[in-house]
């Protein structure tokens, strides 16, 4: 019934299996991939024909994690998987980026790649396996895909690279790098690093590229026995149109690209494009061989050729800069004084307002993943409204691009954050892109660094980012620092590097062509370092380190630690005690399983009140210590006082005052607030307290020759204390 084909190899010490022919047989391509005991299913379906007037390649990659893969039922009301999580969106992009450039130029059939994690062993991360399975399914499908590609994860620990480290090895690694590519070229890199130097990062890329070569061989072997016949696809030949158009508009395009202002340049290009389309389309129907989409496509190709050749020939950029110059930078902090921290970062025509907000444990984000529920304490949200590029558009939940750019900036900042022990706040940074002409994600990195320092977050060091580009024709190439939007679209590489003066914290690379050598990447990294240092120096004109004090509008958090067996005493039955503390003091209190308690409030007195209350519950009173308490019961022989939390002790009638007392209620009544000294314990272990040697107004011990006289005065104070008078009156009512 099934005609299956299976390839198995040993890869990084674990078995990798690729199998096809048994599941999802109606898809154009389907592969079950197994690594260790993690299993994913990848399917590919591509429409037989493009939609009418389709002017782009509609590729969709959907990565989804099934909770049954780890034997769990999803949380929430519906109890089923729903919209993609942030992690699923990021992995979908991770797969999309290296495969998209390898489809044949001009192929516009609707194509969908769906990858499902159907078993997860909690050791082997499924993202790399999903990428490999997608590549294998595409290679088998018959669509014009010039692959295969493969990917690998690289760690760095004890000065050694690790290929595909286990999940439990990652906390010790100084590097989390994913690299993907073909047999001869690197196409994509995504990474987070602990301030590693450029040579270590480049070495990791090449180590990963070498490491996934056996996987490429396995996919090719599977394709040799299981691939479908290639689809008939002949790219459009528009060379005649290109020749004719070049003669007509070359000089006009060159002239338009001498305009340095983005909006003016875009307007000039749009006018020229409209004119050329109208000119070709104005011919009689029988003489016009080309559609408006074809004319627009060739016009875009001509733009790229002219701009690229001009940069290679003159070493000058669209805006007149040389290859390595960074656009003018202006940095400001504290622009929104009632927020916890804020910054405005402007680089040329790219601008970001970044606002930092500090929160408590209640503000941590709960994330439900295949590995279980965890809490995220650093949030970075990137918003790209349409007005930032002078356009109209929808507003709503963030798209894949916004999520991806935000995560890149998150990776750049994350390694430089203080530890939770030294700075126990939840941190949220929001980047509002107000202008964009290239590298808004790196503007977000710079703005976030400044905003966090303005908020008083003690970053290890400031972080900056820069986007690099590449123009390559044959053996000639030019590496561009701080690329414009047009240079990004028309170039061969988008290469983003973020880090500190000491090293790289994040690296993202997308390469559109083969032939990017190790030497080119090395030059690009060195040029990026120079640009990054320049940007850090410019940022330092606004702020060089975290402010000494938090904003007056920020919450204050103090941390205390208690014994684990005391947690239930602080919480109380059904949360009664902790609710009372919160209600009475106004503080926010978060208790962790290890006994760490975080107390938050904008008012220092509130925090101190909550701390005293908790100490009174968990600490043991000391003999000789003086404590404030409440009279809870009176008797002929004395008064029972509740002190130091839930503890009760007896003040014998002889210890109420130095005067002879015939009736306890002549001195105190139930509800009175009194100061007592712990004298010790009787033979039965009962607490013995004394009031007569404590000043009932100040709570200090009475000493010296005037103690008897003072005590007589304080006896009256105890009866006439305004608080006790109020409590008595309330009781009588």
Swiss-Prot record:
| GO terms classed as biological process | mRNA catabolic process; RNA processing
Note down the stretches annotated as region Disordered.
704-733
For bias type Basic and acidic residues, the affected ranges are 708-733
> Which EC number(s) does the record attach to this protein?
2.7.7.8
Q: Which cofactor does it need?
A: Mg(2+)
Q: What SUPFAM superfamilies does this protein's entry cite?
A: Eukaryotic type KH-domain (KH-domain type I) (SSF54791), Nucleic acid-binding proteins (SSF50249), Ribonuclease PH domain 2-like (SSF55666), Ribosomal protein S5 domain 2-like (SSF54211)
Gene Ontology CC annotation, any one:
cytosol
Task: Give the keywords, sorted.
Answer: Cytoplasm, Magnesium, Metal-binding, Nucleotidyltransferase, RNA-binding, Transferase
Family, according to the entry, reads as follows:
Belongs to the polyribonucleotide nucleotidyltransferase family.
* Protein's name according to its UniProt entry: Polyribonucleotide nucleotidyltransferase
- What are the leading ranks of the lineage? Bacteria, Pseudomonadati, Pseudomonadota, Alphaproteobacteria, Hyphomicrobiales
